[in-house]
Amino acid sequence: MVKIGLEVHVHITALKTKLFCSCPSDYTGKDPNTVTCPVCLGLPGAIPVLNENAVKYGILTALALNCQIAEKLIFDRKHYFYPDMSKNYQISQYDGPGSMAIAKDGYIKLNDKIIRIRRINIEEDPAKIVYPTGSILTSKYTLLDYNRSGTPLLEIVTEPDLRSAKEARFFLEKLRSILEHLGVCDCGIEGAMKADVNISVKGGERVEVKNVGSPKDVEDAINYEIARQRASILQGIKIERETRHWDNERRVTVPLRTKETEEDYRYFPDPDLPPYSITPELIEKFKREMPELPDQRAERFVKQYNVTPYQAQVLVNEKALADLFEEITNNYKNYAKVANLLINDYMRWLNENNITVTQSKAKANHIIELFEYLDSGLISIKIVKELLPEMILTGKTPGQLIKEKGMTNIKDENYLERIIDEVLNEEKEAVEKAKRDPKVVNYLVGMVMKKTGKRADPQMTVEIIKKKLGLT
């Protein structure tokens, strides 16, 4: 039996400043160690002051994850010695005597299964450790960038209810969608959502794999670790409790250090941060501000757009995709056609090429224009599928690409008849088969498409071939 638990660290990208100081939380493109102050550098005497908007996003997340919300918020010092934390403790939260996380005892429904949420913490992010000449294992020296130090995080801790790598990936994808719909986190930003993965195989101790970047990486790390632990158990090697690192390039886990226990961190309440009261009125206020969540949106999609429950779930799995779908369907009413294109062609190509919806340059009005060309008969569905990747990469409109490539459908009947006659003369065996089995006409249509660079109008081509073969 396999048990898997996750500790998910989510940057509250909605906040413009850090958790306990006024430094900007967005340090993208800034020189190292330039977005700092005495508080986020951990200098003696610097006093942290809570960014109250972090409480708002913590409560919204707790409500969305069906958690019990604490009456007061208490911050703790989590002590450890590591270069990324200059004051030798992290301001976090702990669910123990004298301590209190912002929320606990929640759940996410994953299909028909309940995945329990143990607790949600608000905490600060450590500094970034940079390995200039290799990886954590091979770099000749290490650099520290404190721009990240003090940026606000939510830590979402599950119970060990997950049983497979695929289930863990699905859980993270659903959690990501919830957080995006709440406006808590733009999970498309690199490093905005990471997970520590705890894995135990029957017969062995729990092993933690730290800082795994994406749901797909989590799936791969778990599969590797399960196989490694099972192989060790079969060889009579005892699985020790330890922390491992996910090597993203080699796609393996490697030992990092012996796993600490909770006692090793010596949690105690931070004397510089007084308890923060969370009143019932405050919770009710945020309940009224709750946006539509993915499950609610999926139900609406089924009713409003008559898509299948599966299609609705795929669409809302990524907020940007659901937004794109609704932007298109505001002006183009063939909902099924839009859903099919986005799920089967658009998203498949994005996933195969590691591009996100927000990175795509194909805008809603471009895709509407593409459907209009298709509906008018100027282009075929094959041309649609050829144009879509270029629209995604370049941002060019279908009209621009069609003009550049001369890709409009050929509707000149005399020209089509001439090409079809050539095909019928060259494919005499297929012609005889088509007279007995009309399905073979599709093969002849394909040969015409080949000769015309896929530009022959499909409907006209079928009609002319059938007429010439006496099948109409």
Swiss-Prot record:
<dbReference type="GO" id="GO:0050566">
    <property type="term" value="F:asparaginyl-tRNA synthase (glutamine-hydrolyzing) activity"/>
</dbReference>
<dbReference type="InterPro" id="IPR014746">
    <property type="entry name" value="Gln_synth/guanido_kin_cat_dom"/>
</dbReference>
<dbReference type="Pfam" id="PF02637">
    <property type="entry name" value="GatB_Yqey"/>
</dbReference>
<dbReference type="GO" id="GO:0006412">
    <property type="term" value="P:translation"/>
</dbReference>
<keyword id="KW-0436">Ligase</keyword>
<keyword id="KW-0648">Protein biosynthesis</keyword>
<dbReference type="InterPro" id="IPR003789">
    <property type="entry name" value="Asn/Gln_tRNA_amidoTrase-B-like"/>
</dbReference>
<dbReference type="InterPro" id="IPR023168">
    <property type="entry name" value="GatB_Yqey_C_2"/>
</dbReference>
<dbReference type="Pfam" id="PF02934">
    <property type="entry name" value="GatB_N"/>
</dbReference>
<dbReference type="InterPro" id="IPR018027">
    <property type="entry name" value="Asn/Gln_amidotransferase"/>
</dbReference>
<dbReference type="GO" id="GO:0050567">
    <property type="term" value="F:glutaminyl-tRNA synthase (glutamine-hydrolyzing) activity"/>
</dbReference>
<keyword id="KW-0067">ATP-binding</keyword>
<comment type="similarity">
    <text>Belongs to the GatB/GatE family. GatB subfamily.</text>
</comment>
<comment type="subunit">
    <text>Heterotrimer of A, B and C subunits.</text>
</comment>
<dbReference type="InterPro" id="IPR017959">
    <property type="entry name" value="Asn/Gln-tRNA_amidoTrfase_suB/E"/>
</dbReference>
<dbReference type="InterPro" id="IPR006075">
    <property type="entry name" value="Asn/Gln-tRNA_Trfase_suB/E_cat"/>
</dbReference>
<dbReference type="InterPro" id="IPR004413">
    <property type="entry name" value="GatB"/>
</dbReference>
<comment type="function">
    <text>Allows the formation of correctly charged Asn-tRNA(Asn) or Gln-tRNA(Gln) through the transamidation of misacylated Asp-tRNA(Asn) or Glu-tRNA(Gln) in organisms which lack either or both of asparaginyl-tRNA or glutaminyl-tRNA synthetases. The reaction takes place in the presence of glutamine and ATP through an activated phospho-Asp-tRNA(Asn) or phospho-Glu-tRNA(Gln).</text>
</comment>
<keyword id="KW-0547">Nucleotide-binding</keyword>
<protein>
    <recommendedName>
        <fullName>Aspartyl/glutamyl-tRNA(Asn/Gln) amidotransferase subunit B</fullName>
        <ecNumber>6.3.5.-</ecNumber>
    </recommendedName>
</protein>
<dbReference type="InterPro" id="IPR042114">
    <property type="entry name" value="GatB_C_1"/>
</dbReference>
<dbReference type="GO" id="GO:0070681">
    <property type="term" value="P:glutaminyl-tRNAGln biosynthesis via transamidation"/>
</dbReference>
<dbReference type="GO" id="GO:0005524">
    <property type="term" value="F:ATP binding"/>
</dbReference>
<dbReference type="InterPro" id="IPR017958">
    <property type="entry name" value="Gln-tRNA_amidoTrfase_suB_CS"/>
</dbReference>
